[in-house]
Each structure stands twice: as C-alpha cells, then as structure tokens.
C-alpha cells in the first residue's frame, strides 16, 4: 500500500482577484522568485510594527544580505507540503499567509497556519479572505483534518479573526515570547477541525 504524499498535490495557488467591502482590489497568489525582495521587506515591515510575531527584523537580515536565499526559499515552498499566499494591492505585497502540513505518518492529518498583514492594510478583510482560501485548500487536501495556530493572548484582532473562522482555544503557552525589555507575552494554541 502506497502512503499519500503531499508531492501528489499541486501546492501552487493560481492568482485570483477579489474586491473587498471598501472597494479595494486584492490579488491572492503564490509568491514567485521575482517577489523575493518585496516579500522580505513586507515581512520585515510587519515584524517591525508588532510584538505579536515570533520573528524580529534581525531574523531576516540574512535574506536581505543575500536575496538569492529568499528566492530559493520561495522555490522550495512550491514543492514542500503546504501553501504560501501573498496578497497584492496594485502590485504591492501587503500580506502573506502560510499553511504547512506535517509530514510524519502519525501527524500528517495536521496543518499549521500563520499570517502577517502590513499594518495599514489590517482590518480591511484581507486576513479573512486569506484564511477562507487557506481553509478551502486544507479541506481539499487529502488526509488533512485540522489546522492549528499559536497566537499571543492579547492579540485582539488576531483572536477575533481566528474565532470567526471556527478556531477554538486548546491550550495556553506561558511566556511564549520574551521581548527585549525582559517582559513576556503569553500564547494560546488554537485549532480548527475541518468538516469534510
């Protein structure tokens, strides 16, 4: 008996245009190698504006120093077990969202999702749109039964989005992140059980 492999799936998301409630046109698509510079700058911009992300701008410096590393990562993401979407407004990358599936026999029914939206584009519906698309992709991926995420417990915008999509709290992570000033942020784990 042959086990399912995610390599059997096309992990590329073809570009789709959406119109938000405010009339803004947003294109969702998989990133291309040519997006590397703009994508890394979007990630650094978000990491600079919030403490809610695991990463800091300095964590991405090696990509800035050698953009070919980011280009290679983008190419790798197309063949790995998951999806990576970017949201573009007039060709500007304003958000990115990743959905990765676990690979081991005992946990391949699980996926993990993360999102980063540029501050001035938050609360417009882009996160909701990206999560809707990722949930559809996960639902249509054979064997995937649940999507998980971690969130800082006082990230009200994030919690509102995740709960609206059906994610439920499953645990607490004390001192999940430690900031430069020595203070800690506590985290929550959440899961969405997919109805297939």
Describe each region flagged by the PLM.
Residues 131, 138-150:
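Conserved GNAT acetyl-CoA-binding A-motif
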Residues 50-61:
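A short gly/proline-enriched turn/hairpin at secondary-structure junctions
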Residues 115-117, 123-138, 159-164:
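Conserved acetyl-CoA-binding loop-helix of GNAT-fold acetyltransferases
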Residues 60-120, 193-195:
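Acetyl-CoA-dependent GNAT
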Residues 26-41:
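A short beta-loop-alpha structural element at the N-terminal edge
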Residues 86, 98, 112-116, 125, ...:
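Conserved beta-strand segments that form the floor/walls of ligand-binding pockets within enzyme
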Residues 2-22, 173, 182-196:
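Terminal substrate-recognition subdomain of acyl/acetyltransferases
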Residues 146-151, 163-183:
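Conserved catalytic-core motifs of GNAT/GCN5-like acyltransferases
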């Amino acid at each position: 008996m042959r086990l399912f492999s995610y390599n059997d799936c096309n992990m590329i998301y073809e570009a789709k245009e959406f119109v938000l409630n405010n009339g803004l046109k947003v294109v969702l698509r998989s990133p291309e190698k040519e997006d590397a510079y703009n994508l890394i700058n979007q990630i650094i911009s978000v990491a600079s504006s919030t403490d809610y992300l695991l990463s800091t701008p300095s964590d991405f410096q090696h990509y800035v120093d050698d953009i070919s590393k980011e280009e290679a990562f983008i190419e790798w993401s197309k063949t790995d077990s998951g999806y990576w979407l970017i949201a573009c407004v007039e060709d500007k990358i304003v958000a990115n969202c990743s959905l990765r599936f676990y690979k081991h026999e005992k946990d391949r029914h699980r996926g993990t999702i993360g999102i980063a939206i540029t501050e001035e584009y938050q609360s417009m519906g882009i996160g909701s749109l990206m999560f809707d698309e990722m949930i559809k992709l996960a639902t249509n991926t054979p064997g995937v039964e649940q999507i998980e995420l971690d969130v800082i417990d006082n990230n009200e915008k994030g919690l509102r989005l995740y709960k609206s999509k059906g994610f439920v709290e499953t645990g607490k992570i004390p001192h999940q992140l430690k900031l430069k000033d020595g203070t800690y942020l506590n985290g929550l784990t959440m899961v969405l059980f997919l109805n297939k």
